[in-house]
């Protein structure tokens, strides 16, 4: 387990040079200041790294989706404009067809074309 609160571990992590960073459902649990710090760290230290994140979004949600958002423990579920401002270094797209029920997620990505990959995958499984 790598505790990034320890400065020695940050140096170790920087030497590791990951080629893929995946943040699954965590951004909506973190305030804007923390996300901006993480984004700066990724941009400055891992600019060539593949990046992918997925989080719920407030965006014309269905009734069930709205209820799930209200019950979510994440205090920072944002709308598309808030995410656009906060995640401006990354590409993004919103989907509502990943799960069997209608539930909107926003994907942020960098250094690969996730949207094209996703659309091709959806065609293949249809």
Labelled PLM ranges:
Residues 13-17:
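Glycine-rich phosphate-binding loop signature in dinucleotide/nucleotide-binding domains
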Residues 36-49:
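A short glycine-rich, Lys/Arg-flanked "PGG" loop and its adjoining helix->strand segment in the class I
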Residues 22:
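A conserved beta-strand element that flanks and buttresses the S-adenosyl-L-methionine
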Residues 25-29:
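Short catalytic micro-motifs in class I SAM-dependent methyltransferases
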Residues 1-12, 30, 34, 51-126:
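Class I (Rossmann-like) S-adenosyl-L-methionine-dependent methyltransferase catalytic domain
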């Amino acid at each position: 387990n790598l505790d990034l609160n320890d400065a020695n571990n940050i140096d170790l992590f920087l030497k590791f040079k990951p080629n893929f960073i995946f943040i699954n459902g965590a951004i909506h649990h973190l305030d804007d200041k923390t996300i901006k710090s993480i984004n700066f760290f990724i941009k400055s230290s891992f600019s060539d790294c593949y990046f992918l994140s997925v989080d719920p979004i407030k965006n014309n949600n269905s009734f069930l989706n709205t209820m799930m958002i209200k019950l979510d423990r994440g205090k920072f579920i944002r709308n598309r404009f808030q995410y656009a401002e906060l995640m401006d270094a990354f590409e993004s797209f919103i989907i509502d067809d990943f799960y069997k029920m209608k539930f909107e997620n926003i994907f942020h990505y960098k250094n690969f074309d996730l949207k094209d990959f996703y659309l091709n995958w959806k065609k293949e499984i249809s």
